[in-house]
Amino acid sequence: MIVIGRSIVHPYITNEYEPFANEKQQILSIMAGNQEIYSFRTSGELSFDLNLRVNIITSALELFQSGFQFRTFQQSFCNPQYWKRTSLGGFELLPNIPPSIAIQDIFKNGKLYGTECATAMIIIFYKALLALYEEETFNRLFANLLLYTWDYDQDLKLITKTGGDLVPGDLVYFKNPQVNPATIEWQGENTIYLGNFFFYGHGVGVKTKEEIIYALNERRVPYAFISAFLTDTITRIDSRLMSYHASPSTPQTSIGFIPIRDDAIVATVGNTTTVY
């Protein structure tokens, strides 16, 4: 269900020729048909969320095709022109290097980088926002970047919730409870849901849910009897908050609305939204 202000609406793309129109319409249809409530104050916030999701998907595919390597933190490496490898295996931005340039280098020179899947997901999020922000804004918000597991800049606002419906552009986690300790890095896989039943995970590539579960099961202890599984934990960029920094020149998606109800009372507690 999609709510704009106090109106429950069924949105649709009005310009079929705009970039990724079909993908955006699919996302809107999924959100409108889900039981989960997606609440926005304005149509502009919905447009930002839609474009952010598309850019998360395209950034995930770009990273997959970049040559970016899968390595444990003990074996991680990065381009020393822009980053310093920390003692824990993270990537610390060098002084006087614009974050926008350093993030783009990961996608241009992926073979010069290697790390685990959680860090890859954060890199994808930064790249998606860079597509929607002026470089000056991005560099101001995300100065002194450190890329290491789930450590991320405090100005990157994320929402993690348990339960809810899967939408393309969501970050979801596959858990492998009986992983072989010799390959502990396969205890789970952070992935971006690409839509059409496919996920991207750094290390497994672009695969279906069943294929990712199979890959994780192959890395369990001998005689394991518990299968890997897709958890119900979903992580998203808080698009309502992050839309404040969007570039005025960012093209807005043309969205029309079929009104369903215009007197909804919306209440949000934590990350749960209810409509009365």
UniProtKB/Swiss-Prot annotation:
Protein's job: Probably plays a role in the assembly of the spore coat proteins by catalyzing epsilon-(gamma-glutamyl)lysine cross-links.
What is the protein name for this chain?
Protein-glutamine gamma-glutamyltransferase
Signal sequence annotation: none
UniProt source species: Bacillus cereus (strain AH187)
Covalent S-S links between cysteines: none
Q: Which domain of life is it from?
A: Bacteria
Family membership: Belongs to the bacillus TGase family.
EC top class named in words = transferase
One of the record's GO molecular function terms:
protein-glutamine gamma-glutamyltransferase activity
What InterPro entries does its record include? Answer: Gln_gamma-glutamylTfrase_bac (IPR020916)
Could you list this entry's UniProt keywords, alphabetically sorted: Acyltransferase, Sporulation, Transferase
Q: What are its E.C. numbers?
A: 2.3.2.13
Q: Which NCBIfam families does the record cross-reference, listed alphabetically? A: PRK03187.1
Biological classification of the source = Bacteria, Bacillati, Bacillota, Bacilli, Bacillales
One Pfam family of this protein, by short name? Answer: TGL
- What reaction gets catalysed by this protein? L-glutaminyl-[protein] + L-lysyl-[protein] = [protein]-L-lysyl-N(6)-5-L-glutamyl-[protein] + NH4(+)
Task: Report any one BP term from Gene Ontology.
Answer: sporulation resulting in formation of a cellular spore
